[in-house]
Amino acid sequence: MKSFNTEGHNHSTAESGDAYTVSDPTKNVDEDGREKRTGTWLTASAHIITAVIGSGVLSLAWAIAQLGWIAGTSILLIFSFITYFTSTMLADCYRAPDPVTGKRNYTYMDVVRSYLGGRKVQLCGVAQYGNLIGVTVGYTITASISLVAVGKSNCFHDKGHTADCTISNYPYMAVFGIIQVILSQIPNFHKLSFLSIMAAVMSFTYATIGIGLAIATVAGGKVGKTSMTGTAVGVDVTAAQKIWRSFQAVGDIAFAYAYATVLIEIQDTLRSSPAENKAMKRASLVGVSTTTFFYILCGCIGYAAFGNNAPGDFLTDFGFFEPFWLIDFANACIAVHLIGAYQVFAQPIFQFVEKKCNRNYPDNKFITSEYSVNVPFLGKFNISLFRLVWRTAYVVITTVVAMIFPFFNAILGLIGAASFWPLTVYFPVEMHIAQTKIKKYSARWIALKTMCYVCLIVSLLAAAGSIAGLISSVKTYKPFRTMHE
């Protein structure tokens, strides 16, 4: 085992996880001294699809059921456009001041610091990393639910659909955590391409299975009642439930597209030719278009199949029972997808902390030293003791939080509401205005500001709906006792 110390690195350009020395002329590096980026629009598209298409795609039938055919499909299309539009603005801000030849910004906070500065940098950090932490906890819960669904599906198949097949989530959360401890040793975002491509394939697979099962239900004629306005007050829901669930549904759709939290980190993996902003815009178009296609299919066909009684997730909530083996496979695909998605959202957190520690403690060998070891089938691998301890601790903590708060998805909705507006809409628009020097009160300025305020209202209403759902969950909460029934 060979040890080497990185304390001589230029910490303004090298972060933990980079296995090269900036001054080493024998290494293949970019103009900023970092390891040469090799990403393309295709790998960036895979990262985006992995980040965006979560198992929530299977809950869109429920969202459309709350809103109806007209509002549901319209909101899906509107937010797909808003997300793509603002992502192109953010892609142009990766370099500053010029989007092609300017200085690179490696994180979302760096971008905000370059264009806006002041307290907005801290606001961005709180929104971004709060969201990333929340997502990693939420994915731990969701993955365990999918794995539990596999066991329950087999139980229902063997004992009948009315059998008591209650299974605890906690062992599955522990297994998911162990897998993440291992994968978290992947040094940085640049090494995640294979994981994202695999996760993207999994997301296509389970979404396609869900769509296929919904089509089969519609073709069989056993469909639920649908309407232009969704669930009916006095029949399906009370007036209060209609309001709160509609708010929550709008928020779910809006947040389902959000990937601004990791956009800059994804763009930082792209090679410089063609220009990163051009490649990222192409990746965003492919990613958002693909996502919208699957969202509309899952949402609309799922609503057509189940009507106003559409379940929250028609795979894990057993909208379907047969064929059980296909449902097992789809739920396993969800779990595998979330294994990759967890890393896409966790890597920016890992690198943020490691970069800070390298800067603050450059002489601490525990933090700066790395060891070169030979790993079977993988070849030479650089291991940092600090990275091993810190990342393992993070995974353990998020897993324990997931076990303590199994209703955390309600909290995640609230976190999504709080972070969607600043990260996906406000900061990209404000930086675009600053970068292109749009005149105040011009037609374009007014249009951009109007979009900002409309999205702010959506976030506030969604937050209200999430709080109502959270209050309902807390009333029945029992720590370490909640089972997936």
UniProtKB/Swiss-Prot annotation:
Activity control, per UniProt: Inhibited by carbonylcyanide m-chlorophenylhydrazone and diethylpyrocarbonate (DEPC).
GO BP annotations, alphabetical order: amino acid import; L-alanine transport; L-glutamate import across plasma membrane; response to nematode
GO cellular component, one term: plasma membrane
Superkingdom of source: Eukaryota
Statement: the UniProt record of this protein carries the keyword Magnesium: no
Bilayer disposition of the protein: Multi-pass membrane protein
Lineage summary: Eukaryota, Viridiplantae, Streptophyta, Embryophyta, Tracheophyta
pH dependence comment: Optimum pH is acidic.
Location(s), subcellular: Cell membrane
Protein name: Amino acid permease 1
Bilayer-spanning residue ranges: 41-61, 62-82, 130-150, 167-187, 195-215, 246-266, 286-306, 319-339, 395-415, 416-436, 451-471
Entry keyword Membrane: yes
Family: Belongs to the amino acid/polyamine transporter 2 family. Amino acid/auxin permease (AAAP) (TC 2.A.18.2) subfamily.
